[in-house]
């Protein structure tokens, strides 16, 4: 079936092969649609501008609510400690940031980093009535060109947004 099945049995070889293939591709996918690599970011931006106000509801509906369990599990896996600083890449409406902020205490903090202003704004109300408002900052920026220096954060995470990044290696 495969010419060189050894590639698929070795994690490093497999990743190199997949990266090489992705680097040569002129197209990528946005959902099930094939789009030019240089147009994907625009498509992602347009899509999330149009769904931002309903994104959280749609996420709950389409996952039958299980995304709440996935998110709590992801935060536990980070093993955050009070005082840590976390970067939430493609943080959108801030669900993961809110969960994380509860673990960080008053000395810690989370930066929600998302390219889409509409998604950020759609989530601002979720922290307004909680005691974590001063632990979460919002920065509009591109996940492929993060504008923070190395070692600025104790941890970084990306949730569902990873599927919308064209050049994951960046």
Label the model's feature ranges.
Residues 39-69:
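Short, contiguous, helix-prone interaction/anchoring segments in small proteins
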Residues 1-45:
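N-terminal auxiliary segments of SAM/dcSAM-dependent transferases
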Residues 85-146:
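Class I SAM-dependent methyltransferase SAM/SAH-binding core
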Residues 154-168:
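A short SAM/SAH-binding and catalytic strip from SAM-dependent methyltransferases
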Residues 144-156:
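A short acidic, Gly/Pro-enriched loop at the edge of an enzyme's catalytic core
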Residues 54, 64-84, 99:
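Conserved alpha-helix/loop element of class I SAM-dependent methyltransferases that forms part
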Residues 69, 95, 117-118, 163-166:
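Short alpha-helical
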